[in-house]
């Protein structure tokens, strides 16, 4: 398009605005035809009231030549009143591919986020490295990876995948704290379908290789699957409500006014948990009954559902929640659930979020599949996470806690500051039936021969439950800080968090880093 020449100051501003408007109209035509928003529409939707300040819009472009800049839009704005840095790849410009200019803009934005100590959000929609720029484009990925690692644990980083994210580009979102995808248009993979077919002979579709369902249900790469772009962006805004701007400031604390609904839900929480340890229930209902306004933002709800993790507020204090889920695989721990819980605990610890753990676990999932999948190495990650955490940690045993799984689920011996149990909780090396079968093998064998097996087993199981699996043993030995009535659970958690508010969260030893089982 033509621009005033020579450009006066007023003419320059007018030309700049005209070029930007023309570029956005072109982007809208291309993206809307695919039922996708433009990069700048996405950022406007993300920031409060659509207000944000773009930086470097014409880097790599030319106002005189009538050409807008790179395939990345970047800037700053407020989310729920707090400053956040964000960028969005622009697929309407050279397929959103990344070259030197795009890499420089992303690195610069992350670097500013680090210096300003504010969260960083990246919206991915790119064809990958710009082939024409060769190794220069690849080197930019290395710079982005390094800068993302530098920001990790310092400021929250969230990725939203709203288009393709392929090749080496996938590792930048993987280095961030949370990844959100949309059901239809989001794809992440290291090698595309054509390369897979050429090298292995396997024919797969984009969805089969790296669609949102794959990464939310199976791989665990993603943390949430939204139906629309708007829902994905809104979910990220909700996440940020619970997170501090950086590790150097306290997590959000909101004014909470007690209300009859929360009080009634807390009093009735026992009704949600069956007394039989074999009967399933949805532990998320328990969580919602104990947190403010029943609001619980779950993370990775589709992956490893035998453990649930997420954020909530208790008396206005933002906390991380970890809980076994009896609705799925009886709440057992397996390789996926272990890694899911471990990384979440590490995140909470990095950003000073207190951790509330609800335990109802029968043990680790048995079988050759789990052993071959590395349950020893991968299960140990939960130990590392809880044992190294220095944030306030409160644990409540709801119904059962058996064996090694009890120990790793935020027990007092592994680092919980305060641990409680409901009166009917069973805490032991294993369940009563299994223990009785081992401890009284000979007696039961004799009873089987004389026809009194069932009566004998029932008697031995009852004896074991009375003498061993009740929480009194744990209280008397100091493994629990108290047995509480279910109706008092919420208030107990509130009182515990108030007590732990001044906890010294400094690491006990100075060292480079631990060498846990990554």
Predicted regions and their residues:
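Ligand-binding clefts of soluble mixed alpha/beta catalytic domains
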Residues: 1-518
């Amino acid at each position: 398009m033509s621009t005033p020449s020579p450009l006066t100051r007023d003419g320059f501003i007018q030309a700049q605005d005209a070029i930007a408007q023309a570029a956005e109209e072109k982007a809208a035509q291309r993206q809307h035809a695919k039922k996708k928003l433009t990069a700048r529409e996405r950022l406007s939707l993300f920031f409060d009231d659509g207000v944000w300040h773009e930086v470097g819009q014409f880097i790599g472009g030319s106002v005189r030549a009538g050409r807008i800049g790179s395939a990345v839009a970047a800037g700053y704005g407020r989310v729920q009143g707090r400053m956040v840095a964000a960028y969005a790849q622009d697929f309407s410009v050279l397929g959103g591919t990344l070259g030197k200019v795009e890499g420089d803009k992303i690195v610069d934005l992350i670097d500013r986020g680090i210096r300003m100590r504010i969260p960083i959000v990246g919206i991915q929609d790119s064809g990958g490295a710009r082939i024409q720029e060769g190794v220069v484009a690849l080197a930019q990925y290395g710079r982005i990876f390094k800068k993302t690692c530098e920001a990790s644990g310092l400021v929250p980083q969230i990725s939203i995948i709203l288009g393709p994210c392929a090749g080496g580009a996938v590792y930048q979102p993987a280095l961030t704290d949370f990844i959100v995808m949309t059901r239809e248009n989001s794809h992440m993979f290291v090698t595309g379908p054509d390369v897979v077919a050429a090298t292995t002979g396997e024919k797969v579709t984009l969805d089969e290789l790296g669609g949102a369902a794959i990464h939310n249900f199976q791989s665990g790469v993603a943390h949430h699957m939204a139906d629309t772009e708007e829902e994905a962006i809104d979910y990220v805004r909700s996440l940020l409500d619970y997170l501090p701007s950086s590790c150097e400031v306290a997590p959000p604390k909101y004014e909470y006014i007690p209300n009859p609904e929360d009080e009634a839900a807390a009093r009735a929480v026992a009704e949600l948990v069956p007394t039989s340890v074999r009967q399933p229930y949805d532990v998320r209902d328990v969580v919602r009954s104990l947190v403010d306004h029943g609001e619980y933002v779950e993370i990775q709800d589709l992956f490893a559902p035998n453990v649930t993790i997420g954020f909530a507020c208790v008396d206005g204090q933002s906390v991380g929640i970890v809980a076994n889920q009896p609705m799925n695989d009886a709440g057992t721990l397996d390789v996926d659930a272990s890694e899911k819980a471990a990384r979440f605990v590490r995140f909470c610890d990095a950003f000073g979020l207190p951790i509330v753990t609800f335990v109802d676990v029968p043990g680790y999932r048995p079988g050759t599949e789990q052993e071959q999948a590395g349950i020893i190495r991968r299960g140990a990650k939960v130990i590392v996470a809880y044992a190294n955490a220095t944030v306030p940690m409160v644990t409540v045993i709801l119904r059962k806690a058996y064996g090694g799984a009890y120990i790793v689920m935020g027990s007092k011996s592994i680092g919980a500051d305060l641990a409680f149990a409901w009166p009917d909780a069973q805490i032991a090396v294993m369940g009563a039936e299994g223990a009785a079968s081992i401890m009284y093998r000979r007696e039961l064998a004799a009873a089987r021969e004389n026809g009194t097996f069932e009566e004998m087993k029932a008697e031995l199981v009852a004896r074991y439950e009375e003498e061993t699996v009740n929480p009194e043993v744990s209280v008397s030995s100091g493994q629990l800080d108290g047995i509480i009535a279910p109706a008092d659970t919420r208030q107990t958690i509130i009182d515990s968090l108030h007590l732990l508010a001044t906890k010294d969260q400094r690491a006990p030893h100075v060292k480079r880093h631990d060498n846990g089982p990554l």
